[in-house]
């Protein structure tokens, strides 16, 4: 199942191109702010997901919450590893499966993890401006699908 999701992403030049271009735009901005924007969108659009983050304390504090900041930074570096692995399907599978372990330990299912798609779309819109497109959002949904398959 993971192998199929990886093949879909790594086998598509369009998906890889959209991921790389959009990640380049996001990385040229403040990487920490991108992660914090994503988490704020997640908690606004999917308030039910806050229950997965109780160990981080008051997530409403945003940047003032060092645990939340740490999670935002870690998340963006994980995404960076994913994008860097697009030309090596076995490597992408390995880094995604490692990432998935933390979520499996917190009993987050693939379906529950899918709740990040809409907040990711909103983050892309906010951070990319005129560079955003539905194709970009679709590419990120496909990459999220790899993680979902690993869960």
Curated annotation (Swiss-Prot):
UniProt superkingdom: Eukaryota
CDD domains for the chain: Mb-like
Alphabetized UniProt keyword annotations: Acetylation, Heme, Iron, Metal-binding, Oxygen transport, Transport
Keyword Magnesium: no
PTM-bearing positions, type N-acetylvaline: 2
Pfam families, sorted: Globin
Domain Globin: 10-151
Molecular function GO terms recorded: heme binding; metal ion binding; oxygen binding; oxygen carrier activity
Binding site residues for heme b: 103
Stated family: Belongs to the globin family.
Quaternary structure (record): Heterotetramer of two alpha chains and two beta chains.
Protein name as catalogued: Globin-1 subunit alpha
Organism for this UniProt entry: Anadara trapezia
